[in-house]
Design a protein with these regions (language model features):
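Short acidic, Pro/Gly- and aromatic-enriched capping/linker segments at domain boundaries
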Residues: 11-25
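Short secondary-structure boundary/capping segments within folded domains
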Residues: 23-27, 66-69
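Residues in and immediately flanking transmembrane alpha helices
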Residues: 43, 146-150, 202
């Protein structure tokens, strides 16, 4: 067993954090997308991910208030080829963290598609607004900071209410709501529910307003949304 693992590791190329100049730059719906050299060398996984990303960004443009798009479009998207640091996608808020972990510092305040194959599979399986979720992290960070007292207070109310401890999931059954993990995830999950469809209950805007009206008000305040 140890020998098999060693052979697999020996045959798997080590992930390389590329410099920005090695990425191919594209524009999708006003968003800047950087595709790594390694990702371009794996079109079987990367091309479907780029097609899906284009659709997901179009959905972001269609769903969020127009005045928020100026902020979102400052957030670049980096496409990698199976970065083992993240299973699918992530938002990078901290240049210090990037430096400590050997990442390209230009990824500060960017969204990274770390694993194109998982990105396509997971979006199609049950996370239709994954890109909006990651962009919500960026918006939260850039506009308010992750220590915003108002967002934090609404999160704390949800956390202590018990109403998110055991909720429906779009794959069936009930689970602890992912938004309970921290203020950032609570904001991103509520954003998905308000503007489209989330994988945890409350799944949509009407349910969010009924289940947690303060969270709905928070989203309307943050994004300048109404209706």
């Amino acid at each position: 067993m140890v020998l098999i693992v060693a052979l697999v590791m020996a045959q798997s190329p080590k992930f390389v954090h590329e410099v920005t100049a090695s990425y191919q730059k594209q524009t999708m719906h006003g968003f800047t997308v950087y595709v790594s050299k390694a990702a371009r060398a794996n079109p079987a996984d990367t091309d479907p991910a780029l097609d899906l990303l284009r659709d997901e960004l179009a959905e972001v443009v269609a769903l969020v208030p127009a005045k928020a798009l100026a902020t979102l479009r400052t957030v670049p998207v980096f496409i990698e080829n199976n970065n083992p640091g993240f299973p699918c996608a992530a938002y990078h808020p901290s240049k210090d963290w990037l430096k400590e972990n050997g990442y390209n510092l230009d990824k500060a305040r960017s969204v990274e598609i770390s694993n194109p194959k998982n990105f396509v599979a997971w979006v199609k399986l049950n996370q239709p607004l994954m890109v909006l979720h990651e962009m919500a992290h960026a918006y939260h960070d850039i506009k308010f900071g992750f220590s915003d007292p108002y967002i934090g207070a609404v999160y704390k109310l949800a956390q202590t209410s018990g109403t998110y401890d055991d909720v429906g999931h779009n794959r069936g059954g009930t689970r602890r709501h992912y938004g309970l993990n921290n203020q950032q995830e609570f904001f991103a999950e509520a954003t998905e529910a308000y503007f489209g469809e989330n994988d945890f209950y409350p799944f949509n805007r009407a349910q969010l307003r009924a289940h947690d009206p303060k969270a709905a008000e928070m989203i309307e305040w943050a994004w300048g949304a109404s209706g």
